[in-house]
Curated annotation (Swiss-Prot):
The keyword rRNA processing applies. Belongs to the RNA methyltransferase RlmH family. NCBIfam families: PRK00103.1-4. It catalyses: pseudouridine(1915) in 23S rRNA + S-adenosyl-L-methionine = N(3)-methylpseudouridine(1915) in 23S rRNA + S-adenosyl-L-homocysteine + H(+). GO terms for molecular function: rRNA (pseudouridine-N3-)-methyltransferase activity. Gene3D superfamilies: 3.40.1280.10. This is Ribosomal RNA large subunit methyltransferase H. The gene is rlmH. One of its GO terms (cellular component) is cytoplasm. Specifically methylates the pseudouridine at position 1915 (m3Psi1915) in 23S rRNA.
Length: 156
């Protein structure tokens, strides 16, 4: 199964990169996992949030793998349980889907990008730092895979 995470933002703290790498290597051969950073648009004089999100949208759309099942992370999305996420992964794998998760920038993402998604998912009702979202999402994806393999990592 192929999973791509597109995350707006670069230059994360070392602990973020290390944590994501740790969970990514745990997937093993069953999952081809890739995290791709999308350059954020600089904010400041003459660039408002809407313009910034539009520029980031263009970069995101260019980075989405051809034919991927698009899942955007958004505070208005559905928050699945770990078991429900595992069921989604199982279905996507059975359908041969390449799944692409998108983590928006500091101002979020455009409505147009959200409308193109086949699923909107919320990780938490809390506001989380972008680096933490990368770690949290990757860990939950690993947890979902471990559930599908009856691995003892996840306990009910």
């Amino acid at each position: 199964m192929n999973i791509t995470v597109l995350a707006v933002g670069t230059k994360m703290p070392r602990w973020v990169d290390e944590a994501v790498a740790e969970y990514a290597k745990r997937f093993g051969r069953d999952v081809a996992y890739a995290l791709k950073e999308i350059k954020p648009e600089k904010r400041g004089a003459g660039v408002n949030a809407a313009q910034g999100m539009a520029a980031e949208e263009k970069r995101i759309l260019e980075a989405i793998p051809q034919g991927a099942f698009l899942v955007v992370l958004d505070e208005r999305g559905k928050a699945p349980t770990s078991v429900e996420l595992a069921e989604h992964l199982k279905s996507w794998r059975q359908n041969g889907e390449h799944v692409c998760f998108v983590i928006g920038g500091a101002d979020g993402m455009t409505d147009r990008l959200k409308q193109q998604a086949r699923m909107m998912m919320r990780l938490s009702s809390l506001t989380l730092p972008h680096g933490m979202v990368r770690v949290f999402l990757t860990e939950q994806l690993y947890r979902a895979v471990s559930i599908l393999h009856n691995h003892p990592y996840h306990r009910e």
